[in-house]
Amino acid sequence: MKEFIAKFSPLNFLMLLAAGIINAIGVTLFIAPVQLYDSGISGTSILLSQLTPDYLSLSFFLILLNIPLLLFGFKRQGAVFSIYAIFTVCVYSVAAWLITDVLPIDVSIASPLSGTDLFLCALFGGIISGVGSGLAIRYGGAMDGIEVVAVIFAKPLGLSVGTFVLIYNVLLYMICGIVMGSWILPLYSIVTYAAGSKTVDFIVDGLDSAKAAMIITTHPDEIARAVSEEFGTGLTIID
């Protein structure tokens, strides 16, 4: 038990706490108030929160959709990664709930650019949420269950992880456009996705590229699990 606990780092938990809060700020103050959509499960949660009664909030769907996916990936990704990821998602969900439902804040007014410039909302929302997601990955967790799903199902479908996530988001934005009866907001959401993706790449690789490594192996599952448990970091499997 002590050996297992020793695998976790207080610094990682602190940075994942910050990551969840930062991501919640980006989504609740820049993206959601102007009806834009984040990527992955976060974007799916935003859409569902728009289509359901008010008491089914964004934070409710974040937990409802993300936690089962992260638990589903427990065996593939290892205990350390799964616990870090679940912690991050819970922080993100609670922070989003506090901002939108508890604190005396009118989010539509508090959003600096709400109702004035959709492009800037999309851009800065993507950058801020990208910082949160990047920090989550950098310190061994994940902000979105779609990453776990991609790692598990991309290979059987003959796709890379990045391509799987891209296809999911394209389908998500198409569904948003059809359901909401407008393509303007889904198209602006692509800006959010692009800005977020570039920011994640910069946070994960750009600040410390010397520690990036590619491992070529015929046993990806075993190595991914061992590296995740030993170093507390996330991995991307490229087929």
Residue ranges and their predicted role:
Residues 156, 234-239:
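Cytosolic Rossmann-like ligand/nucleotide-binding regulatory domains
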Residues 2-221, 230:
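Core subunits and conserved enzymes of cellular information-processing
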Residues 221-224, 235:
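Hydrophobic structural segments
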